[in-house]
């Protein structure tokens, strides 16, 4: 006595579950990360916060803060020109961080290393929301 087990290809199963590369679940995860990250980035004019949904392609697995000074703000340290030693560096002059911290305004969550701090605070919440979304997409298929 024997039996035949017919299983769909793994890529097809992933597709049904929304788990394929650049799929619905990845897009949802990216959107949740971006939404939560907005509360942590520096906010003076709002340019960093506004650039996140514009520059990020949800589903790509990357959330982008697309302003020229994003790295400088994320480091949390004052940066000066290597040669000029001034915060107002010469054109095309490389900058380096010095041991002086930046000050952030408009909320206690804003500060240096926004992604790492957001991840530490919101990781479990984001993963739970993403898991619920994936289950809704699959109509409970993975629980059967």
Predicted feature residues:
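Short, Lys/Arg-rich flexible segments
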Residues: 1-70, 79, 83-144
């Amino acid at each position: 006595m024997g039996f035949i087990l017919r299983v769909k290809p793994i890529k097809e199963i992933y597709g049904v579950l929304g788990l394929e590369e650049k799929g619905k679940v990845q897009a949802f995860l990216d959107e949740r990360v971006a939404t939560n990250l907005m509360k942590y980035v520096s906010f003076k004019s709002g340019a960093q916060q506004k650039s996140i949904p514009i520059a990020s392609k949800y589903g790509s697995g990357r959330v982008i803060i697309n302003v020229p000074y994003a790295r400088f703000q994320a480091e949390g340290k004052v940066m000066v020109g290597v040669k000029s030693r001034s915060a107002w560096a010469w054109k095309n002059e490389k900058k380096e961080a010095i041991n002086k911290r930046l000050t952030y305004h408009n909320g206690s969550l804003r500060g240096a290393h926004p992604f790492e701090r957001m991840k530490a605070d919101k990781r479990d919440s984001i993963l739970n929301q993403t898991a619920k979304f994936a289950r809704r997409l699959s109509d409970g298929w993975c629980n059967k």
